[in-house]
Amino acid sequence: MKNAEIIAKLNLEQKCALLSGAGTFTTRGCPKAGVPSITLSDGPNGVRKQAGAADHLGLNPSVPATCFPTAATVACSWDPALGEEIGRAMGEEAAAQEVAVLLGPGLNTKRSPLCGRNFEYFSEDPYLSGKMAAAYVRGIQSEGIAACPKHFAVNSQELRRMASDSVLDERTLRELYLTGFEIVVKEAAPKTIMSSYNLVNGTYANENAHLLQDILRSDWGFSGAVVTDWGGSNDHALGVKNGSTLEMPAPGGDAVRELLAAVQSGKITEADVDARLDELLTLVLDTSAAVQKHSRSFDADAHHALARRAAAESAVLLKNDGGILPLAAGARVAVIGDFAETPRYQGAGSSAVNSIKVDTLLDCLAQSGLQCAGFAAGFDRQGRPDAAQKAQAVALAQKADTVLLCLGLDEIKESEGLDRVDMKLADNQIELLQAVEQANPNTVVVLNAGASLETPWLAHCRALVYGALGGQAGAGAMVDVLTGKVNPGGKLAETWANAYEQTPAKDNFAGAGRTVQYREGLYVGYRYYQTAGVPVAFPFGYGLSYTSFAYSDLKVTADSVTLTVTNTGARDGAEIVQVYIAKPGAEIFRPAQELKAFARVPLAAGESRTVMLPLDDKAFRYWNTRTDGWEIEGGRYEVRVGASSADIRLTADVDIRGTNATDPYAGKALPHYKSGSVQNVPDAEWEALLGHPIPQDKVRIDRNMTLGELNHSRSPLGWLIWAVLTALLNASFKKGKPDLNVLFQYNMPLRALAKMTSGAISMGMVDGLVMELQGFWIIGLVRVIYEAVKNQLLNAQLERRLRND
């Protein structure tokens, strides 16, 4: 152990105490043993350190910081070097604010476009997600503090996120949901990783030995600290035994007593506690030393400029009929849309940054050389019809050469704690677009949203620019793109389906109960659409430019792909070269093709460049459930190089030596998985892939019952709590602004009451409440009162001992 000398100075109670937080974002310290307390902070696209009363949802104000574009935005740059720059800037700001651990980036696979937190995640593809996340981690940790990639693992929804069970086969787990994390661990060596709230195949992620020990620590060699998501610990002792280091936020004395009792009963050993403590001490001592040495200032203007460049390089030009963009200098433009005045530039929840400053499109246009004919809001942000606003916008559109129409999703559509109900743009925005286009066909739509949308309205605009959620400088970046100061080079990091009904997980996403069946298996995003032959609106990797590019001279080996890329247009630009691997006629079923390498290549007009893209150990492998390892199917593979997953420019074959492993699916009838048509996989085939019966879903009145399930309790108290929460939730929907506190409570299991209240509520009190909800009113009430008195006495005694030791 690295910290054996310090550990030897501590008694068992002190050791156990250090393995849980002291406050919402602080760890416990032990000054007599030389152990300082450190501060952790959100978030993935900027620092959210709260100066006063702290909460994990972003409800209370935080210290001003740079709000960079969200991960979903920067992923469209396909530029790890840019991600590393952003990470370095965030690390610098975190250290300046005395934050030792920055809780990000998030790299959960975008299983469905409806996940309300997709704006925080990079991509539907694990290779792209992993490469971008690794870059962020390297940047953050270059400042001496710790990055904390999250949420490990298979955490793809917000509904019942603290109690849902993600059920999937081992191959899908390894190839699709863990590969991104594997890349981060092996290429960036994060000092911490955050475990997810959910269960994975029946066991909570934070106490899942298969995830934390077998895979994370043994297979990948991770030696850092695993931190729970806030309130995400189910069984603290099992977590410690199976590889979880630090329980957050502040469970109080109950967590300490739980570990002490577990050691005394033999459930865990003191050696287990020491192993976790060694990981924690390494984190605390290394990062606290770095923070102490760091400057307490940073260059806010330089970071704003970086945020603007990042947003500009990530913007995706989806349509440009007749080359209407870029706009000519002096063009007279009408600016329409509420988002031009009040931008949507980040998502809601724990990632929300108190931005140092925020650009608006109106302000930035005034400095662009364009003439502004005027501004009209045009629509109500929350979707309510407003004929007067629409009429004003139509009248303005007639007075301009070009209309800049700013559309997008409002705050209630994309938030932590809440999944989207559809992929649609609000009706009032679509109606406005149709009316404006009739008044002025030269309509350019600027779209702000953190995830994909249905676009049946696409014919009503001449150009469409996707700015995603561009951060505090996103509006300035958009003006740079619209005017041609920046040539858009971004490409989509997720497929845009024609309709939600055509997405692979449409019948299984979020689940009807606690059990969430990942029946689609490997076929997520482009892996599904291209294998099953389903047309899409915009394919994965798609994006236009103000110039054009040619591909030539392809050379392929088992280790690399080399080609020449030429800018054949009149403008400087950047092309994102994408390499996909396919195996026609494969014996082991697999997607039609998979991304295995990419590079962003800047080129001056007329310039040619030779590009070499390495193929790593992930290029040809698959997970074999019979050998329980990575294998390679031997034979001829096709290497496809293109400008998107659907725009393949060059191909070449390469022969690869296989490992001659046994077919893991021999004797199994899996027609839907072999064809990729996985929307309606029958139970028998799903069970054959899983290797066991489908888990039965049943709401149980226990510690893990969520407050949103209390209508199933046997108690008027439970029904009342559920009714009040539901009413508050519906009220926030009507206001168009998510009530994050209510959303969290609605999806929160009862056990979290003991994990999120700084020791005020013990698990014994929760058990008494459960008895009440089961219908045992008197016994339950007596238990709650008894446990409350006991908890207060024990907490006071513990704190006295810890202060005196």
Language-model regions, residue ranges each:
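Terminal connector regions
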Residues: D617-P664
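Long, compositionally biased, glycine/small-hydrophobic-enriched stretches that function as flexible linkers
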Residues: P693-D805
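Charged, amphipathic alpha-helical linkers/stalks
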Residues: S645, A652-V724
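A generic signature of intrinsically disordered, low-complexity regions enriched in glycine/proline
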Residues: G46, Q367, G484, Q502, ...
